Each structure stands twice: as C-alpha cells, then as structure tokens.
C-alpha cells in the first residue's frame, strides 16, 4: 500500500513540490529567498486582510481610518506596521533573489525567469497602489506624479490618465479603485508564483557551480525544509526588530499629514525600494524618454538570457563578470541614494552617469566580459 502523500491527488502535488522533490546537494543560502518570498506574501495577505476589515477607501475617512486602526483596534498598530514593513522585507528578498539569479546564471531557465519578471511588475504595481491608500501627503502626491507619467504616451496619454483617475484629478474614484486592485493583485501574484514554481520544477533548480546536478540529488525534505526554516527564523528576527523598534524608519514623515491637494511637499519621492527606478526616470529631461527608461530599467532583465555569451553558466569562476556584477550592485545603491535627493547639482549629473552605467553594464559590458573570459579559458 502506497503512503497517502504519494497517492492522494492533492497531497501528491505538495509531495512533488516540497517533500520528495529532487534538489541539488550543493545549493547555498542564496536559494532560500524563494521560500522567504512565499512567506512574505503570506504575511502580507494575512496582515492586509485584517487591515481591510477596518480601512475605508473614501477620501474623507481613509486617513482617519488608518489612525483608528493604530489607536483603537486591538494590536492594530502592530498589524499596520507588519504590513508596511512587510513590503520593505518583500522587496529586500525580491532584489536578493533576482541578484542571485543574475550571479549564478539562473536566468537561462527562460520561462521561470520571464514569469519572475512579470511577478516583479505585479509586485511593484501592488506596492505602489498600497502606498496610496493611507491618503497622506506622500500618498496623494506620489499617486499624482506617477499616474501623470502616463500622459507622456502620445495621442492617448491624457485620456488614459483621466480614465485611470476616474475624473480630472486623483480623487475618491482613484482611491476606491486602487484599494480594489491592491486587494486582488496579491492573489494574482500567488497564482503567478505557482506558475513560476511549475516552470522551475520542469527543469529542476540551478546550483552555485552552474553545472548539471542530475547525478547528485537529495530530497527536499528534510534537508532543505530545515535549511529554509533557519532562513525563516533569521528573517523573522530581523523583521520583528524593525517592526517593534524602528517601525517608521523606512516610511516618509510627510505621510503623517493628511492629503492636501493645495499643498505640494518639497520633495516628492516614492518608498526606498522604487528610488533606483525613480532616479533613472528623473535622469532624462524628456517626459516620454523618462517613462521609457523607467519601464526599461526593469524590462532590461529580460535581456539577460539573450545576452549570455559566456560558456560557463555561473559567475563563480568568472572574475571579470563578478567585478561587473558588484559594480552593478554599487551602481544600484548610488541610484537609490540619488532617487531620494532633490533635483539639483551635483545630484543631476551623478544620477545621469549612474543611469548610463546601469544600462551599459547589463547590455554591453557583461556580454563583452563573457566573450573575453571564453578567450582567456581558450573555449
């Protein structure tokens, strides 16, 4: 008689994905971030559900309802800060997960990688709309500035913006629809994540050496369930430190002022995890050009499988590519810093140089490095 997890239709699926899944024996801690992202999504959906029970998506009461959650709801402050900082945690894990994929050549699993890019876009859209909901100053002006970018689209731009707004400015209709989309998108993300896993399990996981691991596989459980559990413990410890000791560290003080269409904040900027893209957007003086650069800053990830020139998959034994990878990480750190600075010298020039460097490293220097390394290894 076969054991239930191998015969029951539902448990069989779980078994193949998380228990008897053959996994490479040498995957490192960098492979923990997939499961950690799943945990982040669960935390966000759970905390978001409880917040939605008390939140009202009306311009007159939205700000007050968030204050009510923090003051009057049992542990409302905790749920609110878990949700707000959970978004930051989500993006930390997301960026580390993508960085891992670039470093070890995981992008050569094209289907998995492309679904991952779609997941990134969906997550960014969800986070943006969630930031609008508290209806503080930065919520309102952030929504106004970012949605207004669509007016740069030739011919249909203005109509498109007014259609998204549901009027002639960011108002009640905008807030209501953003709440509706913010509620539904995480479930779409969850479905897309399952597709992401489906494609991954078609090929099996990559490993740090970037070589086939079919000859040396181990079961996912207990080895990687235990390893993931360690990652979960570390992550939750760091997360709760933030939530309980520094809940407002990553937020904007302006968002503690109710939205006022008659008073523009001195520096309109998004949350820290969008600053690199915001810096790229601002580095181009032309509105349409900036919007295109903004979209391309994420879409450029789709070029990695196409521009992979090296005969080795992983960067583990490719020092020139390693140098360029860390240069890219440093460049993104500079862009993040610039995105939070006012538009004035010397920040304008630094932002423009960093933006050019960002695209140059990915589109020109990394493929060249791969070819040079092939020559050096006489491949």
From Swiss-Prot:
Binding note for cofactor: Binds 2 heme b groups non-covalently.
Cofactor list: heme b
Gene Ontology molecular functions: metal ion binding; ubiquinol-cytochrome-c reductase activity
Residues annotated as binding heme b b562: 83, 182
Cell compartment(s), UniProt: Mitochondrion inner membrane
Main localization, broad class: mitochondrion
Membrane topology according to the record: Multi-pass membrane protein
Cellular compartments per GO CC: mitochondrial inner membrane; respiratory chain complex III
Annotated positions binding heme b b566: 97, 196
InterPro entries: Cyt_b/b6_C, Cyt_b/b6_C_sf, Cyt_b/b6_N, Cytb/b6-like_sf, Cytochrome_b, Cytochrome_b_C_euk/bac, Cytochrome_b_N_euk/bac, Di-haem_cyt_TM
Keyword field contains Zinc-finger: no
Superkingdom of this protein's organism: Eukaryota
One GO biological process term: mitochondrial electron transport, ubiquinol to cytochrome c
Annotated a ubiquinone binding sites: 201
TM regions (residue ranges): 33-53, 77-98, 113-133, 178-198, 226-246, 288-308, 320-340, 347-367
Keyword annotations: Electron transport, Heme, Iron, Membrane, Metal-binding, Mitochondrion, Mitochondrion inner membrane, Respiratory chain, Transmembrane, Transmembrane helix, Transport, Ubiquinone
Pfam families: Cytochrom_B_C (PF00032), Cytochrome_B (PF00033)
Complex formation: The cytochrome bc1 complex contains 11 subunits: 3 respiratory subunits (MT-CYB, CYC1 and UQCRFS1), 2 core proteins (UQCRC1 and UQCRC2) and 6 low-molecular weight proteins (UQCRH/QCR6, UQCRB/QCR7, UQCRQ/QCR8, UQCR10/QCR9, UQCR11/QCR10 and a cleavage product of UQCRFS1). This cytochrome bc1 complex then forms a dimer.
Note, other: Heme 1 (or BL or b562) is low-potential and absorbs at about 562 nm, and heme 2 (or BH or b566) is high-potential and absorbs at about 566 nm.
Role this protein plays: Component of the ubiquinol-cytochrome c reductase complex (complex III or cytochrome b-c1 complex) that is part of the mitochondrial respiratory chain. The b-c1 complex mediates electron transfer from ubiquinol to cytochrome c. Contributes to the generation of a proton gradient across the mitochondrial membrane that is then used for ATP synthesis.
PANTHER family in the cross-refs: CYTOCHROME B (PTHR19271:SF16)
Protein name: Cytochrome b
Gene: MT-CYB
